[in-house]
């Protein structure tokens, strides 16, 4: 049996922490789909097209990876594509409470889908897309927190 997992998120922007979780999950599953959530009620800095482009460029050459977008509930997307696992990265204990509650609801909605929690590597445990955007808005360097293409796009977008 093939083990297919999805790694869902808004990835606005993609960070080195996201890449850490992704690369480690590729060692655990036969295939991983990075599933970019499209939420018309949520305001994003980067368009879905920009986020797709960043992820495609940064992950070129990674085996066992697919990139897609989805709307609606994550578990519905899992069932649509035949995924049996959802990957979630945890930076700190505070992430766990939120993610655990969501995983319990997901289990009620889709008993066939498991949530797999991966702890962030220490050097990425403080990185979040929200923090990266805030630091970049104040003109500070975020080049160690995001891939180069994302860092350049952040500077350009925030200087407009």
UniProtKB/Swiss-Prot annotation:
Its EC number is 2.7.7.3. SUPFAM superfamilies: Nucleotidylyl transferase. Substrate binds at residues 10, 42, 74, 88. CDD domains: PPAT. GO terms for cellular component: cytoplasm. It catalyses: (R)-4'-phosphopantetheine + ATP + H(+) = 3'-dephospho-CoA + diphosphate. The record marks 18 as: Transition state stabilizer. GO terms for biological process: coenzyme A biosynthetic process. Its cofactor is Mg(2+). ATP binds at residues 10-11, 18, 89-91, 99, 124-130. Disulfide bonds: none annotated. It holds the Pfam family CTP_transf_like. The keyword Phosphoprotein does not apply. InterPro entries: Cyt_trans-like, PPAT, Rossmann-like_a/b/a_fold. Pathway: Cofactor biosynthesis; coenzyme A biosynthesis; CoA from (R)-pantothenate: step 4/5. Belongs to the bacterial CoaD family. Homohexamer. NCBIfam families: coaD_prev_kdtB (TIGR01510), cyt_tran_rel (TIGR00125). This is Phosphopantetheine adenylyltransferase. It comes from Leptospira borgpetersenii serovar Hardjo-bovis (strain JB197).
């Amino acid at each position: 049996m093939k083990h297919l997992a999805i790694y869902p998120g808004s990835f606005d922007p993609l960070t080195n922490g996201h890449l850490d979780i992704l690369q480690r999950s590729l060692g655990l599953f036969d295939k991983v789909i990075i599933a970019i959530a499209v939420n018309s009620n949520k305001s994003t800095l980067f368009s879905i097209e920009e986020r797709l482009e960043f992820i495609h460029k940064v992950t070129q050459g990674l085996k066992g990876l697919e990139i897609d977008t989805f709307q609606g509930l994550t578990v519905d997307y899992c069932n649509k594509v035949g995924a049996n696992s959802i990957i979630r990265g945890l930076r700190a204990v505070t992430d766990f409470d939120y993610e655990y509650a969501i995983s319990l609801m997901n289990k009620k909605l889709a008993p066939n889908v498991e949530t797999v929690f991966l702890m962030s590597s220490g050097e990425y445990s403080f990185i979040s897309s929200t923090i990266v955007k805030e630091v970049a808005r104040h003109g500070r360097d975020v080049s160690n927190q995001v891939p180069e293409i994302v860092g350049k796009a952040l500077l350009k977008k925030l200087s407009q």
